[in-house]
C-alpha cells in the first residue's frame, strides 16, 4: 500500500498509510501463428470492458485512450514474433487485494484474473484484428500456458543505507544525502 507523509516526507503521500495495492496481471505471451487462431468467445465477454485500452471511437473517455492498437501490441514486443501483453490501461489488469486472503480465496482471484486476460485476448483478436496472435505454448510449463504466478507492478521500498524518495527528485540539492552525485538506474515505463 501507500506510505504516509511522515514516513518519507513526501507531500503527495496520503496522511494515513493504507493497504491499497496496484492491480495484478496474468501476463500473456502471444505468438504470431501466421494464420487465424481465434479463441472461443469467453463467458461474460463484453467488448466495452476494453474499449479504452487503445484509441477507439467507442471509448467514452477518448482523452484517456492515447495508444493506438499497433502501439499497444508493440509495447511488449519480444523476439521471434511474440508479444507480451501486460496492459494496465483498461486491459488485462485485475484488482484484488490478496493480503488478507487465504489460499483458496487467492485461487479464485487468480482464476478471475486469467479469465480477464482471456477476454482481453478475444478482444485483441476480434475487435483489434490481430487474430493471428494467440497464447504461445512455448513459454510456460503450465497447462493453460499462463505464468506460474501473476505479475505485480508494485513492491515495497527497500530500506537501505539511504532510501530514495520523491524529494530526491523534486529538490535534489536540499537532501541530507547528496544522491544527485551518484548513479541511479532509471527505467522507461511508457504507460
Which functions belong to the PLM regions below?
Residues 1-191:
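Flavin (FAD/FMN)-binding glycine-rich loop and adjacent Rossmann-like elements that form
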